[in-house]
């Protein structure tokens, strides 16, 4: 059981890294923060299509990561 959870954790980590790297950057760097990037921060922008899917998948994989870590640490006691 412990080995199975560790294998799931490794797969989850690889998937999480891949999904994060596939996402587009949301800011225009340091210059955007100084010269009016606040309107993007506080403006209502809806994510659509692939961006929305990648965002939700990142959240799901992150939650799965923490649940697996808690289960592995609980079984390790």
Curated annotation (Swiss-Prot):
RNA-binding as UniProt keyword: no
One GO term of the biological process aspect: intracellular protein transmembrane transport
Entry's transmembrane regions: 2-22, 57-77
Taxonomic superkingdom: Bacteria
GO cellular component annotations of the record: plasma membrane
GO MF entry, a single one: protein-transporting ATPase activity
Major location category of this protein: membrane
Bilayer topology: Multi-pass membrane protein
Keyword Protein transport appears in the UniProt entry: yes
Record-linked InterPro entries: SecG
Keywords attached to this entry: Cell membrane, Membrane, Protein transport, Translocation, Transmembrane, Transmembrane helix, Transport
Any Pfam family matching the protein: SecG
Annotated localization: Cell membrane
PANTHER family: PROTEIN-EXPORT MEMBRANE PROTEIN SECG (PTHR34182:SF1)
Protein family: Belongs to the SecG family.
NCBIfam families, per database record: secG
Biological role stated in the UniProt entry: Involved in protein export. Participates in an early event of protein translocation.
The protein's name in its UniProt record: Probable protein-export membrane protein SecG
Organism of derivation: Staphylococcus aureus (strain MRSA252)
Gene: secG
């Amino acid at each position: 059981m412990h080995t199975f959870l560790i294998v799931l954790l490794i797969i989850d980590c690889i998937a999480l890294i891949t999904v994060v790297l596939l996402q587009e950057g949301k800011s225009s760097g340091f210059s955007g923060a100084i010269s009016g990037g606040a309107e993007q921060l506080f403006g209502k922008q809806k994510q659509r299509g692939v961006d929305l899917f990648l965002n939700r998948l990142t959240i799901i994989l992150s939650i799965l990561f923490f649940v697996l870590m808690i289960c592995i640490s609980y079984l390790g006691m």
